[in-house]
UniProtKB/Swiss-Prot annotation:
Gene3D superfamilies: Transthyretin/hydroxyisourate hydrolase domain. PANTHER family: 5-HYDROXYISOURATE HYDROLASE, URICASE AND TRANSTHYRETIN-RELATED. Homotetramer. GO terms for biological process: purine nucleobase metabolic process. It catalyses: 5-hydroxyisourate + H2O = 5-hydroxy-2-oxo-4-ureido-2,5-dihydro-1H-imidazole-5-carboxylate + H(+). GO terms for molecular function: hydroxyisourate hydrolase activity. Its main location: periplasm. This is 5-hydroxyisourate hydrolase. It is found in: Periplasm. It is an enzyme of class 3 (hydrolase). Its EC number is 3.5.2.17. The gene is hiuH.
Amino acid sequence: MLKRYLVLSVVTAAFSLPSLVYAAQQNILSVHILNQQTGKPAADVTVTLEKKADNGWLQLNTAKTDKDGRIKALWPEQTATTGDYRVVFKTGDYFKKQNLESFFPEIPVEFHINKVNEHYHVPLLLSQYGYSTYRGS
């Protein structure tokens, strides 16, 4: 009986694994914001994803960071395409909620997607009067 259960569990896991891998890889874009002044994640920050178009920027998606300062799946439910994109972090609202001034009402970070089968992570290290970003993993 135990052997049958073990075999059934292994078979079930083997068929489930590709689905889990696909689910983990299907969203190609994530962001993470850390407040450098407090050393803590920046929760509840609105972030917008936009694609460069001939006449400006086309909004694709908007979400808010979770309690860990993350948006794990910012790419909308559509097929990824190569091109120029930007994420816009609405940092002014974040600091305003804390009764703090900020020099940057929003921080746009432009980047290029040249491989749609890769994951793109955009971390933002934030303070009231400065920021830093890079391509994360």
